[in-house]
Amino acid sequence: MGSNAAAPAHNRNQTSQILQVYNHFFLIDCGEGTQMLLKKHKVKLSKIQCIFISHLHGDHYYGLIGLISTMHLYGRTESLKLYGPPGLGEIISIQLKHSNTSLNFDIDLKEWTPGVSEILYENDKIYIETFPMDHRIACSGFLFKEKPLKKKILKEKLPTDILPSQIAQLKKGNDVINGSGKVLYKCDDYTAEPRKSLSYAYCSDTKYTEDILSSIREVDLLYHEATFLEDMADRADLTFHSTASQAAKIARKAKVGKLILGHFSTRYRDLDPVLDEARKVFKESYLGVEGEDFILIE
């Protein structure tokens, strides 16, 4: 959705992303104007089940109370899961209190622990884990990782009298064994290996740090901030941000599949130099452009 840094500029908005995993929609960060972008790109607010806030700099969460208020206005009743840094709950409570707003729905808030990795969310398909960024205030990255998939059943090979419970065992990778220990159906005879589980890592505001490599190693898709070009590396270090080449260096060292660049400084109207700089280090680098999809599997 949004890909700019501190302020909107050059038809680029502040940070926000929608990640769809199966039928689950996750909003990652919520900069100013996010709800307008969701409407523009036809993402129904009712589909958003979880929101993840990386840190409490305004360009990453100033759109949150407006989005929550609109969800209320539209009659939402389903609970909203909200994950963010310490202090986010207090901010939301104050905003609702002083606007005399009593929401139609519950906010299930969990504030993550700064400086450590922890699992925030888990369902039968994926889990979502935090990992620390190196920024001026408490800031977290998020790893979205698909759980190992079950074996693919070769339906054409299944006996007609096999039971559903026995098929379930084969999917789990188990041989089907009767009460006396005899193998009735060998898993390898009736199944094929599933595709590789997919993963996405979101690296919000951070200076260059290799401490994150263990958390993002070999992910299929990596988003990493690229606020500056390399000629402003000193400025990047001073403000706890990264350059495009530094983001690409992290992608290369972590052996990721593809890199999305974002969080661009307002000083850059033309982003071609940002992309060129990154691709000199890591070929599979791409600009985070509003409305553009990065699809890992159809």
Features from the language model and the residues they span:
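Local beta-strand/beta-hairpin segments that build beta-sheet-rich folds
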Residues: M1, G115-E122
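Conserved beta-strand hairpin/beta-sheet module of binuclear metal-dependent hydrolase folds
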Residues: M1-H41, K47, S79, F142-F144, ...
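Active-site metal-binding loops of divalent metal-dependent hydrolases
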Residues: S3-N4, G33, L56, G87, ...
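Active-site-proximal loop/helix segment associated with metal-binding centers of metalloenzymes
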Residues: H10, Y121-Y202, T206-S215, L221-Y223
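Divalent metal-coordination and catalytic microenvironments
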Residues: D29, L38, H55, L82, ...
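Active-site metal-binding motif and surrounding structural segment of the metallo-beta-lactamase
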Residues: E32-Y83, E111-T113
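Active-site neighborhood of divalent metal-dependent phosphoester bond hydrolases
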Residues: R76-T113, R267
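Cap/insert and terminal regions of metallo-dependent hydrolase folds
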Residues: G173-D293
